[in-house]
């Protein structure tokens, strides 16, 4: 009987602990700035100068260096803007990033190549959302920034087209 009471107490304690850990932080619906730190694999979202929340991310399969050409599997570096929102993406939902800019296009053209495009902040591939944070085990995108489906839901809802995004090394 004593063991049963201890087991029940442990289960209740774990349930309470889990409920505190799993509560979602509510973020205001006004993300004005996104900062991506590629080397740390984190993305910070801001309202003006106030940090709202930090997310762990996965990047392109070859994350070192600035994206220069279509198919190089790199994630861009520099200052861009959110230029689109797609709730029907192949990756749950996505926010478009304004890569390539004029400078990116000119560099690629000078080399006789395409700069590429379609760089996004997105969730997991449709039907794979249950893997959650396991996607962080390695960089797997074609140059995009990936978060969990739950995370893209809150980022998507709080970000307007035109928000600034700065991608650092």
Language model features: what each stretch is:
Residues 25-63:
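A structural motif detector for short, solvent-exposed N-terminal "entry" segments of globular domains
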Residues 31, 52, 77, 90-92, ...:
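Sequence-level motif detector for i,i+2 pairs with an aromatic at +2
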Residues 33, 54-56, 79, 118, ...:
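Well-ordered beta-strand positions in beta-sheet-rich domains
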Residues 2-3, 12-26:
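Bacterial Sec-dependent signal peptides at the C-terminal "C-region" and cleavage site
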Residues 22-32, 59-83, 102-107, 149-150:
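N-terminal post-signal-peptidase region of extra-cytosolic proteins
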């Amino acid at each position: 009987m004593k063991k049963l009471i201890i087991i029940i107490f442990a289960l209740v304690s774990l349930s309470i602990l889990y409920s505190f850990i799993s509560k979602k932080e509510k973020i205001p619906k006004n993300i004005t700035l996104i900062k991506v730190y590629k080397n740390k694999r984190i993305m910070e979202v801001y309202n003006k100068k106030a940090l709202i929340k930090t997310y762990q991310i996965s990047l392109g399969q070859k994350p070192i260096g600035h994206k220069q050409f279509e198919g190089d599997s790199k994630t861009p570096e520099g200052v861009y803007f959110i230029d689109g929102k797609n709730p029907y993406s192949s990756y749950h939902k996505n926010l478009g990033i304004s890569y390539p800019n004029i400078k990116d296009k000119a560099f690629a053209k000078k080399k006789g190549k395409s700069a590429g495009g379609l760089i996004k902040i997105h969730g997991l591939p449709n039907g794979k959302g249950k893997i959650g944070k396991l996607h962080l085990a390695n960089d797997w995108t074609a140059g995009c920034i990936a978060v969990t489906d739950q995370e893209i839901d809150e980022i998507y809802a709080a970000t307007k087209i035109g928000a600034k995004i700065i991608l650092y090394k």
